[in-house]
């Protein structure tokens, strides 16, 4: 078994525990009380992505920020990291915590998991916020190829042996943290924390497996309109920075799909890691969106 990842960063008001979920140990950071709000981080991050928003959201909600399989302080087992497996992890976590329905704030591949959960089990999702990822129901057009050069890392990370080496490269990861960001989007200290955890061999292999098993397949399904043919009824806010590729996708493509209540907001001058750079904006929009009265 791989040794300790790193010392757990401390955040006032946040408690930590590990739970056995479907055969692996997942780390969960928790704060506050009230209705449950689950935060799903992105690549190559962990629960610490939410350290700026958790204290603000915890004044109104029971905030639950797991390290998803293969990341942070959770187990990083070998094998496939398919979308179905990751969705089942979230369902298992909710069952273990005794949560029958929750709000979700998600980022990057965590936003893919959140949207798939909302499609498969809408009974579990009260409302959903997507950051750092497109609405999977958009209808791409031929101009989509213009975005491909910006996504080179997704294809490279998915390649066995090469992908893990990329994830362990501080120089490459530094580029990914700054390529689509305003100056100071992610602090040097936070980048170091994320990189220290993600560079461990088991987690580097997990990251590559994630791109092969979930992220690239999801991208292809978006291209071919697979998700757009499915019912989608969960109230959803897509909140993305104008500097990131997801914003380009949203501008190029028309939304399609049956049903649904999806609102898109593109934030000028912000990038991919919007929760790191503007936690007050993200938490403020989250509380406003989650409090919006909805028809029964």
Regions found by a protein language model. Name each.
Residues 31, 267-269:
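Conserved beta-strand termini and adjacent loop/short-helix elements that scaffold enzyme active sites
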Residues 48-51, 205, 284:
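Alpha-helical elements of the RecA-like P-loop NTPase motor core of helicases
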Residues 270-279, 283:
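Catalytic histidine-centered segment of alpha/beta-hydrolase-like enzymes
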Residues 2-17, 24-26, 36, 64, ...:
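Flexible "cap/lid" subdomain of the alpha/beta-hydrolase fold that forms the substrate-access gate
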Residues 27-73:
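Conserved HGGG/HGGXW glycine-rich cap/lid loop of the alpha/beta-hydrolase fold
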Residues 46-47, 112, 271:
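A short, glycine- and basic residue-enriched loop/turn
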């Amino acid at each position: 078994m791989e040794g300790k990842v790193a010392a757990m960063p401390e955040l006032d008001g946040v408690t930590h525990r590990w739970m056995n979920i479907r055969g692996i140990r997942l780390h969960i950071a928790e704060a506050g009380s009230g209705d449950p709000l689950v935060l799903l981080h992105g690549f190559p991050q962990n629960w610490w992505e939410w350290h700026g928003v958790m204290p603000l959201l915890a004044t109104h909600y029971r905030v639950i920020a797991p390290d998803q399989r293969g990341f942070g302080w959770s187990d990083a087992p070998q094998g496939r990291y398919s979308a179905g497996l990751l969705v089942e992890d979230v369902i298992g976590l909710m069952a273990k915590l005794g949560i029958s329905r929750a709000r979700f704030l998600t980022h990057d591949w965590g936003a893919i998991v959140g949207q798939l959960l909302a499609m498969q089990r809408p009974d579990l999702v009260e409302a959903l916020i997507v950051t750092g990822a497109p609405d999977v129901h958009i209808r791409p057009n031929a101009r989509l190829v213009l975005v491909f050069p910006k996504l080179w890392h997704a294809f490279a990370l998915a390649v066995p042996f090469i992908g893990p080496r990329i994830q362990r490269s501080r120089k490459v990861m530094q580029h990914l943290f700054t390529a689509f960001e305003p100056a100071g989007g992610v602090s040097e200290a936070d980048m170091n924390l994320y990189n220290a955890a993600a560079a461990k061999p088991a987690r580097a292999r997990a990251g590559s497996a994630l791109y092969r098993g979930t992220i690239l397949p999801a991208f292809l399904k978006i291209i071919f309109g697979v998700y757009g043919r499915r019912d989608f009824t969960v109230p959803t806010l897509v909140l993305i920075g104008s500097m990131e590729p997801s914003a380009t996708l949203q501008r190029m493509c028309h939304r399609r799909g049956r049903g649904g209540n999806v609102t898109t907001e593109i934030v000028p001058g912000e990038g991919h890691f919007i929760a790191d750079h503007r936690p007050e904006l993200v938490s403020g929009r989250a509380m406003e969106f989650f409090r919006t009265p909805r028809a029964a």
